[in-house]
């Protein structure tokens, strides 16, 4: 136990040094939610990738939080189980799942610490920009609507109509989006 505490203290101190270093130049430090478990400066942003429980814990410690749950916003996961899908890292996050994301249960004061939603695309299997676009679109539309709209309950059928129009607009700059199912 003693050595574990020493490692946690050193990790926290190192994190604080980095946060102070970037803050002096006017930037904010952002750490993955594992680092948010350390008792660190409340100005350090926590990127909550492991889910709403970790996001809520970071908020309750006073950290600003960016929601990036791997269960909904990891766009390097498959969009469909169809065998025609390009190779992905694993997992399955279809469009409906992105659209259906529920924010963590927080008080209004706690919710003010949530600074936004973010999708991540890790590119180990995505060897060109066309594949990155394919994995992002149309899921990025669902994420954007979830982030910027307060309609509840959300109407997936209505969203799909809006998404179809948006995908038409993306054809002009030749974005390689996945078609709607």
Name the predicted role of every residue range:
Residues 1-6:
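Short, small-residue-biased leader/transition segments that mark boundaries at the very start
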Residues 13-20, 24, 53:
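Alpha-helical scaffolding segments of alpha/beta enzyme cores, especially the outer helices
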Residues 28-45, 49-181:
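Flexible, acidic glycine-rich loops studded with aromatic residues
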């Amino acid at each position: 136990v003693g050595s574990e505490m020493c490692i946690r203290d050193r990790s926290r101190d190192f994190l604080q040094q980095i946060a102070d270093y970037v803050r002096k130049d006017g930037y904010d430090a952002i750490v993955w939610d594992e680092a948010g478990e350390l008792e660190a400066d409340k100005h350090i942003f926590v990127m909550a990738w492991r889910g709403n429980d970790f996001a809520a814990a970071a908020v309750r410690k006073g950290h600003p939080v960016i929601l990036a749950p791997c269960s909904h916003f990891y766009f390097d996961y498959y969009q469909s189980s169809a065998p025609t899908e390009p190779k992905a890292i694993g997992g399955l996050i279809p469009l409906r799942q992105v659209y259906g994301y529920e924010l963590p249960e927080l008080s209004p004061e706690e919710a003010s610490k949530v600074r936004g939603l973010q999708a991540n695309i890790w590119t180990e299997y995505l060897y060109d920009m066309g594949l990155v676009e394919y994995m992002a679109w149309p899921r990025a539309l669902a994420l954007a609507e979830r982030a910027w709209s307060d309609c509840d309950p959300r109407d997936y059928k209505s969203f799909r109509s809006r998404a179809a129009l948006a995908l038409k607009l993306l054809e002009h700059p030749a974005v390689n989006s996945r078609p709607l199912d």
